Amino acid sequence: MSTLATSQLVATHAGLGVPDASMFRRGGVQGLRAAARASAAAGDALSMRTSACPAPRQQPAARRGGRGGRFPSLVVCATAGMNVVFVGAEMAPWSKTGGLGDVLGGLPPAMAANGHRVMVVSPRYDQYKDAWDTSVVSEIKMGDGYETVRFFHCYKRGVDRVFIDHPLFLERVWGKTEEKIYGPDAGTDYKDNQLRFSLLCQAALEAPRILSLNNNPYFSGPYGEDVVFVCNDWHTGPLSCYLKSNYQSNGIYKDAKTAFCIHNISYQGRFAFSDFPELNLPERFKSSFDFIDGYEKPVEGRKINWMKAGILEADRVLTVSPYYAEELISGIARGCELDNIMRLTGITGIVNGMDVSEWDPSKDKYIAVKYDVSTAVEAKALNKEALQAEVGLPVDRKIPLVAFIGRLEEQKGPDVMAAAIPLLMEEDIQIVLLGTGKKKFERMLMSAEEKYPDKVRAVVKFNAALAHHIMAGADLLAVTSRFEPCGLIQLQGMRYGTPCACASTGGLVDTIIEGKTGFHMGRLSVDCNVVEPADVKKVATTLKRAIKVVGTPAYEEMVKNCMIQDLSWKGPAKNWENVLLSLGVAGGEPGIEGEEIAPLAKENVAAP
C-alpha cells in the first residue's frame, strides 16, 4: 500500500466511526486515553475449537540458574513481573522488512531481562530450523468454516518465540522472506491478507492459554489469562475486537488488556467495506472499522480500516518516538487521516533501542579495523580507506565520505537524495548509496553513479557486510526521510561514531542533537508524488555544511558524543514497562533492573 500522507480529503466524524463531532478532544501526546467506552453486550460463542474454560494462572518455576547456577552471569532476573504477549507480522531475525521486525526482535528480551514473562507471536513464514512443533493445534473460525493452525516454539534470550503455522503463511514465502511477507513483490499485496492476519490475531489469543511452555528457568505452564497483549501495526488491528467478542464476553481473559503500537501510520490496512463480514466480528464493531477516504484503491469511497479499529479498541495507544506522536496528531497530512482518532484516544511515544550486540564496532567481523570510543578517529579513517577501495572510489582519507543506506521507497526519500547529488558535485566529496526496493529508485541511484563515476557509488542489492563497513568508514550519514517514525539507521550510525545529517521528523528529532551528534536539515514535505526543490536545497545545504566540519576537532568531538550514547533497549524497556503497568492487569508487578541474556548458542534453546 503506497503512502497515504498526501490525501487532502478531510474524514468526517461519521466516516471515523464516532457518533458525534463533540466527542473529539485532544487526549494529549502522552495522555491517558479517554474514559472507557461502555461495556459490550454479551458476545458470540468462542470461535476456536479449543478448551473454552479459563486457563490456569501460570506459576513461577523454582529458581534455577541463579548466580553460580546454570548460567552464572548472563541470566534473566526474575520477579513476579507481568505476562506480556507481543503480536506482530514480523519478528527479527526470523522475518523482517523494516523497523517492526527489529522492535519485536529486540524489545522483548529487554522486557524479559527485567523479570517479566514475555512471549512473541508471529507467522511461520519459513521452516525455521530453531523452531520446534509443539504438537498443539487449534481450529479457528474463518468465514463459514474452520482453519487448523499449529504452534511452533523456541526459547531464546529469555523470550518464548511462538510461530503460527498455516499454509496461508508458509506456502507464500520461500527462502528469504524480505518483501514477500505482505505480497509477491514490493508494493503488491496478497489479495487475502485480511484472512492471513485475521488468522494471526485469533491464533495469538489462543497461545497464552493453551501452550504449556517450560523452557524459562523461572516460569512454567501456560501464561494464563492475566495478560497484556501488545499489538503492532494494522495487521493486529482486530485483535482487541476478537478478545472482547470471543473471550471476555464468555468470562475468559476478563482482566486482560491490549496496547496498540503504531510503527508506521502510512500502512493502515484499508479494505472494501463489504469485506467486514469476513472478519467474523459482531456488528457492534463495524463503526470502529468504518472509514471514508479520497482514494480509489482498493475500492472508491467507504472502506474498513484495520489500524483505526486497533487504535479505538485498544486500552492504550503507543508509537515509536515522542516527536512522531506529536506529528501524528498534528493534522491530516502526517496523521494520514487518523489524527482525529488519536487526539481522542491519546498516544504515548517511546523511542526504540537497537541491537547493540549485532552493531558493535569493537567486535564487528565485517569491518577492516575494530575500534571503540578511544580509538575511533584513527580507526574510522582506516576503515574509510578500506571502504573506498572496496567500492572502487579513489582512496583518500581526506575526502569527506557521505553514505545513504535505506529501503528504496518514497518514505526514505531516495529521490530527494538523488536530486541533491548534482548540487554536491562541486564539493570535494564522495557518496556511497546502498539499498534495494522499487526499481525506479534503483535506477535513479545507478544513474547517479553513471553520471559521476569518480565521486558516486550505488549498490542496489542486499549486502549486510557492506552496510557494516559503510557505517565504520563513512564520515556522515544522510537520512532524507519524508517521515520517520523512529529510525534505526541513525542509531546504528551513532553506535559507529558516524554523525547523521537528517531530516527533522519523527524519531530523528528525538535522537539526533544538532551540533552534538549530527545536523538537522529541517522538515521535508510528506508529499511522496513530487520532489520539492526546497527539499533538495535543504539536503544539499546541510550536507555542504556538514562536510566542512569533517576532519576538525569539532567533528572528532561529535564522533565521541555519538559513541557514548546508550542506544540499547534497556531504557526503552523500562518506559514500556511503566506504560503497561498503568493498565492494571491483575498480578502485574514492576520488574527489576536486569541484564539481557546475551545471544549465545547455549541460550538458543528450542522446545523439546
From Swiss-Prot:
Seed specific. It catalyses: an NDP-alpha-D-glucose + [(1->4)-alpha-D-glucosyl](n) = [(1->4)-alpha-D-glucosyl](n+1) + a ribonucleoside 5'-diphosphate + H(+). GO terms for biological process: starch biosynthetic process. InterPro entries: Glyco_trans_1 (IPR001296), GS/SS (IPR011835), Starch_synth_cat_dom (IPR013534). ADP-alpha-D-glucose binds at K96. Residues 1-77 form a transit peptide. GO terms for molecular function: ADP binding; alpha-1,4-glucan glucosyltransferase (UDP-glucose donor) activity; IgE binding. The keyword Kinase does not apply. It is found in: Plastid, Chloroplast; Plastid, Amyloplast. Keywords: Amyloplast, Chloroplast, Glycosyltransferase, Plastid, Starch biosynthesis, Transferase, Transit peptide. Its main location: plastid. The keyword Transit peptide applies. GO terms for cellular component: amyloplast; chloroplast. Belongs to the glycosyltransferase 1 family. Bacterial/plant glycogen synthase subfamily. PANTHER family: GRANULE-BOUND STARCH SYNTHASE 1, CHLOROPLASTIC/AMYLOPLASTIC (PTHR45825), GRANULE-BOUND STARCH SYNTHASE 1, CHLOROPLASTIC_AMYLOPLASTIC (PTHR45825:SF3). This is Granule-bound starch synthase 1, chloroplastic/amyloplastic. The lineage of its organism: Eukaryota, Viridiplantae, Streptophyta, Embryophyta, Tracheophyta.
